[in-house]
């Protein structure tokens, strides 16, 4: 209970208070302000997604409009290229996952696909410069390194520190879906 914690600590730290967070933490910061508006002086929810359904559906249209047409094409071309090269890239992907002791609840091939699907959202969410996307003619290593830097598999590991959020998202809060049409 953030209210009880804040109340207790204000006796030790009587200065200004801030609440902040990203994703679920952003939701918490936002809702904390709603229910206890006088507990903190400033609320900074960096990302506070409030989904309308288990699979929200608003993200896919947003991804079809954000940036320029050339930006969106560059993103999709990159995704298509790493899918085309999956057979060549998967061994290095698997090696990296093994070295990091990653374990998953789905086959590694599906985790790779999820990384590719997550890419279009992640690149915008983290403010990555679209010019940093490698050309489709780039080497296998260059393409895989870029994919891993933007939407790596740690997002999907079994012992993820965000696992409880994903369970809550699946059961209560909702989450965004993936538009798979361009990749069929």
Could you say what each language-model-derived stretch is?
Residues 95-184:
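Alpha/beta-hydrolase fold active-site neighborhood
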Residues 18-20, 42-45, 169-171:
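Structural recognition of the beta-strand scaffold that forms the well-ordered cores
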Residues 1-12:
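Alpha/beta-hydrolase active-site loop
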Residues 38-100:
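A catalytic-pocket lid/entrance helix-loop region that shapes and gates access to the active site
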Residues 21-31:
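Glycine-rich nucleophile elbow surrounding the catalytic serine of serine-hydrolase chemistry
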Residues 23-24, 47-50, 174:
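Short, flexible loop/turn elements at secondary-structure junctions
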Residues 13-23:
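Alpha/beta-hydrolase fold nucleophile elbow
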């Amino acid at each position: 209970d953030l209210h009880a914690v804040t109340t207790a600590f204000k006796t030790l730290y009587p200065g200004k208070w801030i609440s902040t967070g990203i994703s679920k933490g952003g939701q918490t910061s936002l809702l904390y302000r709603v229910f206890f508006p006088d507990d903190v002086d400033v609320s900074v929810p960096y990302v506070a997604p409030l989904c309308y359904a288990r699979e929200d559906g608003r993200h896919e249209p947003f991804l079809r409009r954000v940036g320029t047409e050339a930006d969106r094409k560059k993103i999709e071309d990159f995704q298509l290229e790493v899918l085309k090269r999956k057979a060549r890239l998967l061994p290095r992907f698997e090696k990296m996952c093994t070295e990091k002791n990653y374990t998953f609840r789905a086959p590694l091939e599906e985790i790779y696909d999820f990384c590719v699907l997550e890419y279009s959202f992640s690149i915008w969410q983290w403010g990555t410069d679209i010019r940093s996307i490698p050309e489709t003619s780039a080497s296998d290593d260059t393409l895989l390194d870029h994919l891993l830097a933007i939407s790596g598999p740690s997002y999907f590991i079994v012992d993820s520190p965000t696992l409880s959020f994903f369970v809550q998202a699946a059961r209560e809060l909702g989450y965004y879906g993936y538009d798979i049409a361009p990749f069929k």
